[in-house]
């Protein structure tokens, strides 16, 4: 009998083991779709970004005009630009759901996969930040100025560090040029890390909603989950199409339609919506260095989650108290996102401070205590 080429060919064999004959738990739900959706988002962003880069000019006197030129004069340039801008938003929606799934079902206990995922999140945030600067509108310029200036909070090296990143004494042409270089390069680094992320995942196999070993009940990835993923792809593409075609500026900031002007500060400087939760945590601490450290720790705290897992059960499926705390965390994130977009005045300052304390308390105190208490209740000690 002739051997199947997909199982013997050196390259096709890798594809086969990843996408076709991969043994997958039979009970994984819709929440396991988001990994493949992130892959789709990355492909969309790289392709649209490549076409935008062909027409974009990374120079402060031409950047804003080149974006207008793309939208007006390039064939379907307006569509490519709208897909790229809104694709970033959907990318972050998928990332946050993917992380939430990992937190809820205990997927973080695959430590290597989880830690690479956190590094991927940092790279994604860096890519989105430098990308937001490129159109060189008011919010691009002032967002870049404010966020990079936070590095000056670090003792001794802070000011030198900021000037090194700026390439001068203010956000200027050198800054825009290097940010364009970073924005072009980082997605390829993300792609490489994504391959390693998947590699580590396939060393252990996927987790499942029960949090139990599923070796006795696996099914092949194709056709079962390839079709299930295809449904997710279709849903995402319809959403992205609707957003890019009907409401392309819904998630953007009106200030960015004004060319960058170093002499006029916008009334409210704020980043894109997907950074607002971290921005709210940053603003809730009156001390500059304290705020920067809180901002960093709001993401780095994800690295501590596997170490703070106290429950004898992996998943939250049968842990009611942990479920309550998880949904408080989700609500808290939404509150922080809302606060990040509000002006710095009462009662927003107080709400932001309470939400920030709650955010860290849930990770560091509430969740570990809930796991310990549930062990006691179920006499699993």
UniProtKB/Swiss-Prot annotation:
One of its GO terms (biological process) is mitochondrial electron transport, ubiquinol to cytochrome c. CDD domains: cytochrome_b_C, Cytochrome_b_N. Heme b b566 binds at residues 98, 197. Its cofactor is heme b. GO terms for cellular component: mitochondrial inner membrane; respiratory chain complex III. It comes from the Eukaryota. Heme 1 (or BL or b562) is low-potential and absorbs at about 562 nm, and heme 2 (or BH or b566) is high-potential and absorbs at about 566 nm. It is a multi-pass membrane protein. The chain crosses the membrane at residues 34-54, 78-99, 114-134, 179-199, 227-247, 289-309, 321-341, 348-368. GO terms for molecular function: metal ion binding; ubiquinol-cytochrome-c reductase activity. The keyword Transmembrane helix applies. A ubiquinone binds at residue 202. InterPro entries: Cyt_b/b6_C, Cyt_b/b6_C_sf, Cyt_b/b6_N, Cytb/b6-like_sf, Cytochrome_b, Cytochrome_b_C_euk/bac, Cytochrome_b_N_euk/bac, Di-haem_cyt_TM. Binds 2 heme b groups non-covalently. The gene is mt-cyb. The cytochrome bc1 complex contains 3 respiratory subunits (MT-CYB, CYC1 and UQCRFS1), 2 core proteins (UQCRC1 and UQCRC2) and probably 6 low-molecular weight proteins. Heme b b562 binds at residues 84, 183. Keywords: Electron transport, Heme, Iron, Membrane, Metal-binding, Mitochondrion, Mitochondrion inner membrane, Respiratory chain, Transmembrane, Transmembrane helix, Transport, Ubiquinone. Belongs to the cytochrome b family. The keyword Lipoprotein does not apply. Component of the ubiquinol-cytochrome c reductase complex (complex III or cytochrome b-c1 complex) that is part of the mitochondrial respiratory chain. The b-c1 complex mediates electron transfer from ubiquinol to cytochrome c. Contributes to the generation of a proton gradient across the mitochondrial membrane that is then used for ATP synthesis. This is Cytochrome b. It is found in: Mitochondrion inner membrane.
């Amino acid at each position: 009998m002739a051997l199947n080429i997909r199982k013997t060919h050196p390259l096709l064999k890798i594809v086969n083991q990843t996408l076709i004959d991969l043994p997958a738990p039979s009970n994984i739900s819709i929440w396991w779709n988001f990994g493949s959706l992130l892959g789709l988002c990355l492909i969309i962003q790289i392709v649209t970004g490549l076409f935008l880069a062909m027409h974009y000019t990374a120079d402060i006197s031409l950047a804003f005009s080149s974006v207008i030129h793309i939208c007006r004069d390039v064939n379907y340039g307006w569509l490519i630009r709208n897909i790229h801008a809104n694709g970033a938003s959907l990318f972050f929606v998928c990332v946050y759901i993917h992380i939430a799934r990992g937190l809820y079902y205990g997927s973080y206990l695959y430590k290597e996969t989880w830690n690479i995922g956190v590094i991927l999140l940092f790279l994604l945030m860096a890519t989105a930040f430098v990308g937001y600067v490129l159109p060189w509108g008011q919010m691009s310029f002032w967002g870049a100025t404010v966020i990079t200036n936070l590095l000056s909070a670090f003792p001794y090296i802070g000011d030198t560090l900021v000037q090194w990143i700026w390439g001068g004494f203010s956000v200027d042409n050198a800054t825009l040029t290097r940010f364009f270089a970073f924005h072009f390069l980082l997605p390829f680094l993300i792609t490489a890390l994504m391959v390693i992320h998947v590699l580590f995942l396939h060393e252990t196999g996927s987790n499942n909603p029960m949090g139990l070993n599923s070796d006795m009940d696996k099914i092949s990835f194709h056709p079962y989950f390839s079709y299930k993923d295809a449904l997710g792809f279709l849903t995402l593409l319809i959403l992205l199409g609707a957003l890019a075609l009907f409401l392309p500026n819904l998630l953007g900031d009106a200030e960015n339609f004004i060319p960058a002007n170093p002499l006029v500060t916008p009334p409210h400087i704020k980043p894109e919506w997907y950074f607002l939760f971290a921005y709210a945590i940053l603003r809730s601490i009156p001390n500059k260095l304290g705020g920067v450290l809180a901002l960093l720790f709001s993401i780095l705290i994800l690295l501590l989650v596997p170490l703070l897992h106290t429950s004898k059960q992996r998943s939250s499926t049968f842990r009611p108290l942990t479920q309550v705390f998880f949904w408080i965390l989700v609500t808290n994130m939404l509150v922080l996102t809302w606060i990040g977009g509000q002006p710095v005045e009462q009662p927003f300052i107080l709400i932001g401070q309470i939400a920030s304390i709650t955010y860290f308390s849930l990770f560091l105190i509430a969740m570990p205590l809930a796991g310990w208490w549930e062990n006691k209740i179920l006499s699993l000690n």
